[in-house]
Amino acid sequence: MPRKAYTKQQEVLPDPIYNSKLVSRLINKLMLDGKRGTASSILYKAFDRIQSETGNDPVEVFQQAMENVMPVLEVKARRVGGSNYQVPIEVRPERRTTLGLRWIVQYARLRSERTMEERLSKEIMDAANGTGASVKKRDDTHKMAEANRAFAHYRW
């Protein structure tokens, strides 16, 4: 038990253009060295690109992408009798969104397109269509949990 009281998690304010907390959290994940202006500019340009290419509302496309990327199960290492077991556990809702955002940004950065706006928009569109590296990461995480299902009774 910690000696100090837990600090309350800071509330994320919705972004000014789309009025969405999820978009605001994506801006925070994109941000490097505290440059929020640069991060939001990249995101809004990526959303404009999504709007022009798909003709749909970019926030809806992004929410669909998040649904396809967020994991339901993951594995956690648990030491029992001198050996480590990968124990499958359910992912809490807050962690699901955090992992989804993290994977979308991480795999967008690894893409080969020229600009970050292009990489991010393509990754979001791919994720919304059920393809892309971030969706593959979710599938791999689920496969890992399924493969270690035998150790589910070690859950704590």
From Swiss-Prot:
Annotated family: Belongs to the universal ribosomal protein uS7 family.
PANTHER family xref list: RIBOSOMAL PROTEIN S7
Protein origin, superkingdom: Bacteria
GO biological process: translation
Protein name: Small ribosomal subunit protein uS7
Source organism per UniProt: Oenococcus oeni (strain ATCC BAA-331 / PSU-1)
Molecular function GO terms recorded: rRNA binding; structural constituent of ribosome; tRNA binding
Matches recorded under InterPro entries: Ribosomal_uS7, Ribosomal_uS7_bac/org-type, Ribosomal_uS7_CS, Ribosomal_uS7_dom, Ribosomal_uS7_dom_sf
Keywords (A to Z) from UniProt: Ribonucleoprotein, Ribosomal protein, RNA-binding, rRNA-binding, tRNA-binding
Gene3D superfamilies attached to this UniProt entry: Ribosomal protein S7 domain
Quaternary structure, from the entry: Part of the 30S ribosomal subunit. Contacts proteins S9 and S11.
GO cellular component, one term: small ribosomal subunit
Residue ranges the record marks as coiled coil: none
Function description: One of the primary rRNA binding proteins, it binds directly to 16S rRNA where it nucleates assembly of the head domain of the 30S subunit. Is located at the subunit interface close to the decoding center, probably blocks exit of the E-site tRNA.
